[in-house]
Amino acid sequence: MLTAVTGINWGDEGKGRVIDLLAEQADVVVRYQGGNNAGHTVVTTQGKFVLNLLPSGILHPGVVCVLGDGMVVDLEHLSREIHEIEKKGIRVTPDHLKLSKRATISMPWHKVQDELEENRLAKTGSAFGSTRRGIAYAYSDKYRKKTLRLGDLFHLKEDSVKARLKTMLVAKNLELAGCYHQEPMSYPALLTWCEEQAELFGPYIADTGEYLEQAVSEGKKVV
């Protein structure tokens, strides 16, 4: 059985609360889009949990949580979020959490761009009010095909992926230098960052479309 929870663009509508209630009876809880700019707070007997990327289903034993194709994932933030809930006794494993190989990676430069642009606008009193987490920049690059997807982390040794990464970095360094007079980012440092994320999150990355198709065919409850 499939259950979809969506809003009508009013902002804080209580979607997370509804999902938390539905998750109690679900087998799989999927977040299909967004990044870590959103958030919801869940209070249980184990404490207070503030979640930005993880669905609240992560707090329910036996529920599989999926971060879907449409998401932009800040892997450093996700690592911290997992660490925080594990400190309160919630164990997170690749059997419990699956990341779509087609989801977009929020790259280090996305937060840098967001911060610099917001600071520039603030000087003229026209700051946008951004969360400074790089979400808009990550989505912009997603649609311009100027970023990596999680599945690319499996192929960092391939020349084609290295070439794409270098091309993206050259363009970003031109933007950062031309618009904000910033020092260029280093390719070796960026590649090392990608390799570290691959080692940490590789076991969690999966073909979630295939997984969900199988879950539905088996009659599982998917929210």
Model-inferred region functions:
Residues 1-223:
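Non-transmembrane, aqueous-exposed alpha-helical and coiled segments at domain scale
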